[in-house]
Amino acid sequence: MLPCFQLLRIGGGRGGDLYTFHPPSKSGCTYGLGCRADLCDVALRPQQEPGLISGVHAELHAELQGDDWRVSLEDHSSQGTLVNNVRLPRGHRLELSDGDLLTFGPQGQAGTSSSSEFYFMFQQVRVKPQDFAAITVPRSKGEAGGGFQPMLPPQGAPQRPLSTLSSAPKATLILNSIGSLSKLQAQPLTFSRGGGRPQGLAIPSQHGEAQVSPAPPTRNRRKSAHKVLAELDDEVSPGPLSVLTEPRKRLRVEKAALIASGE
């Protein structure tokens, strides 16, 4: 038999709701009660007037003392929390005793807590371990239980072990100025416009300054084309001169023959 404490709902015409609490840690924990089911361990959803219960209306703080749990109630609401028909000051903690009557929200229309929708009895009990399936599990495991919680994959989901991940550096694709793709591995490479071999960049020195090797001189295609044309002109130019000089020689010979025949 393990020590636990309970909240038994006895008011509002819906009695019989029972909440059993057994903190999982001996250091204690906190249980939230309110209309926000995503923030509280016990959801108090009013059916008559929704505005009577705050998002986090109150908190139960449990601390282990000897063989039993010491439980105190703290109010965080705007409509109030009553213990034995006495309103608890907001932000004030009150230690509960076995048999105390708790009212969350204002009193009922008749002016008594018994007519309230959320009217509970607090009691200290001992529960067998086989009955722990009905115990309310707290969202907060302790006073300092809030904080980052890692997101874990669901059970049975395939997981890749970290040992299979490759430690080799990943390749990087860079688009250079002339529109070609360069694949870089451990050492970055650059490509010249003339189609030569890739030129490697020097490894940075210890002072963090990179020494870049001078790029090869670019070729001036236009200049080389003019040079070729000039050479062609030199080769072709003697041809027409020889053609023109040959008729002149023949003309002189014919003229000399006519002069000789005229004489």
UniProtKB/Swiss-Prot annotation:
Keyword terms: Nucleus, Phosphoprotein
SMART domains documented for this protein: FHA
Superkingdom of the source species: Eukaryota
Record carries keyword Phosphoprotein: yes
Listed Gene3D superfamilies: 2.60.200.20
GO biological process entries: G1/S transition of mitotic cell cycle; regulation of gene expression; type B pancreatic cell proliferation
Coiled coil: none
Pfam families in alphabetical order: FHA
Cell location: Nucleus
Phosphoserine found at: 78
GO cellular component: nucleus
Boundaries of every FHA domain copy: 31-88
Region (Disordered), start-end ranges: 140-164, 189-225
PANTHER family: TRANSCRIPTION FACTOR 19
Function of the protein: Potential transcription factor that may play a role in the regulation of genes involved in cell cycle G1/S transition. May bind to regulatory elements of genes, including the promoter of the transcription factor FOXO1.
Name of protein: Transcription factor 19-like protein
Higher taxonomy: Eukaryota, Metazoa, Chordata, Craniata, Vertebrata
Protein's gene: Tcf19
